[in-house]
């Protein structure tokens, strides 16, 4: 059976439509403001060339905003980067799905494609504006969000260090409860997404830990026990010895959410549920607040240098984990392509085979969920593993708060019931899932 159609802005009034009409131009306007505001910095760093580059970038972004708002055709990329050809091939693929004479455009093409395309065009605008071609237009917002989340970060680092101090005294049941708690922290940390707030302040200002009980009813799919079962399969039944166990985390947002991912990764090692954790980040600035290698390393450095005992202890431990290769950071251009994940084996076989080495792959956040499910109009009750179509590299778990109108694996009637009481339940970030597929 063919999968359902892709979500797109052609459905007037849909979240995709409102995103392309309002939110994406708003993000682009913020990019224009940021670049313009840094004009003096570009001059200090690069002289007149920096000022000329700023003008070029502004002109590029203004033109891009106009193309979007007037539903112009999607254009090929011209920046000769490693992924340029793949993007242009994907544009040809999108053309091949249309009738003769039709062209992919902002409001007609799949939402997943045009939203990813906007961020790749932002990168193109910077790349084509040397000498500022390495500039991250979203870095200021990510840094600000990190510092505004300090109270919540301190609370979480303190909690982790206390937990590790008392670990020997915990029963197996207590350890399980602690892991469930940290999975929930990881889930609700995903609320902090600057691409949804249009780049406006969306930091975590209070400790999530005290709210977990009250948040629990809002977890629509809760596969935490099954996730733990997958992790517990690490003991060899004959010898009782622990096997090497690898967990991968495909990251979403920098800032507070990244700290929740680090805390979970630390606990997995401390509980001996994993012997190594592999993190996957983006190779370019993406979706306003997504984690790049710079954000990853910068965050650990900030914690190391913090004037707070437990924050700096966490930073030191995490740096050590990287040094000893208990933690490994990867980046791959596939994560910033528009492709659904069911195309990974064909488009990026090296990445697919890397994920096949994992015992559990955790996908954080909404964009990953959209790519896992193809961002299609699935019925709410379709099983998660079915919506993944051919993407089954390893047991995988999606941890996301809902901020896009795609959701599968719900019990019959739940989606309809929520619509009748809360029309925006799929986009508010109020509800979440911890959803597992063990199909391999």
From Swiss-Prot:
Gene Ontology biological-process entries: DNA damage response; methylation
Protein residues bound to S-adenosyl-L-methionine: 257, 290
Domain of life per record: Eukaryota
One Pfam family recorded for the sequence: ARMT1-like_dom
Keywords: Hydrolase, Manganese, Metal-binding, Methyltransferase, Nickel, S-adenosyl-L-methionine, Transferase
Motif placement: Subfamily III RTxK motif: 400-403
Catalytic activity field: beta-D-fructose 1-phosphate + H2O = D-fructose + phosphate; beta-D-fructose 6-phosphate = dihydroxyacetone + D-glyceraldehyde 3-phosphate; L-glutamyl-[protein] + S-adenosyl-L-methionine = [protein]-L-glutamate 5-O-methyl ester + S-adenosyl-L-homocysteine
Post-translational modification, as annotated: Automethylated.
EC number: 3.1.3.-, 2.1.1.-
Cofactor: Mn(2+); Ni(2+)
GO cellular component, one term: nucleus
Molecular-function GO terms, alphabetical: fructose 6-phosphate aldolase activity; fructose-1-phosphatase activity; metal ion binding; phosphatase activity; protein carboxyl O-methyltransferase activity; protein-glutamate O-methyltransferase activity; S-adenosylmethionine-dependent methyltransferase activity
Annotated signal sequence range: none
Family recorded in the similarity comment: Belongs to the damage-control phosphatase family. Sugar phosphate phosphatase III subfamily.
Function according to Swiss-Prot or TrEMBL: Metal-dependent phosphatase that shows phosphatase activity against several substrates, including fructose-1-phosphate and fructose-6-phosphate. Its preference for fructose-1-phosphate, a strong glycating agent that causes DNA damage rather than a canonical yeast metabolite, suggests a damage-control function in hexose phosphate metabolism. Has also been shown to have O-methyltransferase activity that methylates glutamate residues of target proteins to form gamma-glutamyl methyl ester residues. Possibly methylates PCNA, suggesting it is involved in the DNA damage response.
Protein name (database record): Damage-control phosphatase ARMT1
UniProt source species: Xenopus laevis
Gene from which the chain derives: armt1
């Amino acid at each position: 059976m063919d999968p359902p159609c892709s979500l797109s802005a052609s459905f007037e009034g849909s979240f995709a439509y409102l995103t392309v009409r309002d939110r994406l131009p708003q993000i682009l306007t913020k990019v224009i403001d940021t670049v313009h505001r840094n004009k003096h910095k570009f001059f200090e760093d690069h002289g007149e060339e920096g000022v000329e580059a700023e003008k070029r970038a502004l002109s590029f972004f203004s033109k891009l905003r106009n193309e979007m708002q007037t539903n112009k055709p999607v254009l090929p990329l011209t920046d000769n980067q490693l992924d340029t050809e793949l993007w242009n091939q994907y544009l040809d693929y999108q053309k091949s799905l249309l009738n003769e004479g039709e062209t992919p455009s902002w409001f007609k093409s799949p939402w997943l494609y045009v939203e990813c395309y906007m961020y790749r065009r932002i990168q193109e605008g910077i790349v084509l504006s040397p000498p500022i071609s390495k500039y991250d237009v979203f870095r200021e917002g990510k840094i600000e969000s990190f510092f505004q989340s300090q109270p919540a970060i301190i609370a979480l680092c303190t909690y982790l260090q206390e937990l590790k101090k008392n670990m020997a005294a915990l029963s197996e049941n207590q350890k399980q409860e602690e892991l469930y708690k940290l999975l929930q922290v990881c889930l609700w940390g995903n609320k902090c997404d600057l691409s949804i707030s249009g780049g406006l302040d969306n930091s975590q200002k209070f400790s999530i830990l005290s709210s977990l009980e009250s948040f629990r009813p809002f977890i629509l799919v809760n596969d935490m026990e099954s996730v733990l079962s997958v992790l517990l399969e690490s003991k060899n039944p004959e010898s009782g010895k622990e096997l090497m166990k690898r967990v991968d985390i495909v990251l979403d947002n920098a800032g507070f959410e990244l700290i929740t991912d680090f805390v979970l990764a630390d606990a997995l090692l401390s509980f001996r549920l994993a012997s190594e954790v592999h993190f996957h980040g983006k190779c370019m600035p993406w979706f306003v607040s997504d984690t790049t290698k710079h954000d990853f390393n910068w965050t650990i450095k900030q914690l190391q240098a913090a004037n707070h005992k437990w924050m700096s202890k966490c930073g030191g431990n995490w740096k050590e984990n990287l040094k000893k290769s208990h933690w490994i950071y990867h980046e791959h251009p596939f994560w910033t392509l528009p492709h659904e994940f069911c195309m990974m084996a064909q488009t990026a076989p090296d990445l697919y085979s890397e994920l096949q080495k994992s015992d559990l792959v955790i996908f954080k956040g909404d964009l990953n969920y959209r790519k896992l499910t193809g961002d299609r109009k699935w019925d709410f009750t379709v099983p998660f593993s079915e919506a993944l179509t051919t993407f089954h590299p390893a047991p995988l778990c999606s941890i996301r708060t809902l901020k896009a109108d795609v959701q599968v694996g719900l019990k019959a009637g739940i989606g309809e019931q929520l619509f009748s009481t809360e029309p925006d339940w799929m986009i508010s970030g109020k509800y979440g899932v911890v959803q597992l597929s063990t199909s391999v």
